[in-house]
Amino acid sequence: MILGNILKKNGLKQGIDMKLLAGDLPTGVASTFISPDGERTFGTYLGAAATMKAENLTLDMFKGYAYLYIEGYLVQDHELILRAMQLGKEAGLQICLDMASYNIVEGDLEFFDILITKYVDIVFANEEEAKAYTGKDAWGAINEIASKCSVVIVKLGAQGSCIKKGTECIKLEVPPVKKLVDTTGAGDYYAAGFLYGLTCGYSLEKCSIIGSILASNVIQVVGTTLSKKKWDEIKLNIEALLQA
């Protein structure tokens, strides 16, 4: 529980309403191995996370929110992810799915298709994950996925990102990066910035700009924690770009 308590304390400090379940096993851990070029590989111990069951979820947990963001890793428990999405829909939330990993997608392709077609409103994927799902390159993949959900975002690494909603298509370049140190958290920061933009009512282009700014900053540090000074700089940068 030590790591779990640290997570809870930090979340509450940031004003997050933490809905955590306690179990007998230790908190899960993901050890990150960073290569010289800044790419990363995870070694994971799921711990208590593996004991979470569909019956642990209640409708009250989903009330008062606008979006439910689910990592594709959760598809390993079909019953759990289905209940989460069903409760989210019942509570009136938009469902966001991050495909998580191309091998996860390849290993459960039919189930991913059911989720996206029936429940998911917004899909986040990188180029490899989108190709694993559709068998097509970036634009071919984005067109196919967009035919099954409301919004699809395909992240292209250093090449930026593609976003499509209906007939609206956007291609954005990535902000300049001084030095790539560690790609851990880049996708999560992008999604966080994008969803923040949506909750503020910004256009898809501005949502993507915010996500790209966050992602480009986190890859320049080891780990996923940015200093208060850096956050202040990021906020000013975002405000300037949004007003331009």
Model-derived features: positions:
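Substrate-binding N-lobe of the ribokinase-like
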Residues: M1-V29, D232-A244
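Hydrophobic beta-strand scaffold residues
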Residues: M18, I95-C96, V152
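Conserved phosphate-binding/catalytic loop of the ribokinase/pfkB sugar-kinase fold
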Residues: K19-G23, T32-H78
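Short beta-strand scaffold segments in enzyme catalytic cores
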Residues: V29-F33, T41, G160-K164
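Short, acidic/turn-prone active-site loops that include or flank metal/cofactor-
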Residues: L46-A49, A100-Y102, P175-K178
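Alpha-helix C-terminal capping/helix-to-coil transition sites in glycosyltransferase folds
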Residues: K63-G64, K118-Y119, K148
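Conserved beta-alpha-beta core of the PfkB/ribokinase-like small-molecule kinase fold
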Residues: Y67-N143, Q159-S161
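Conserved phosphate-binding/catalytic region of the ribokinase-like
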Residues: Q86, E90, A138-A244
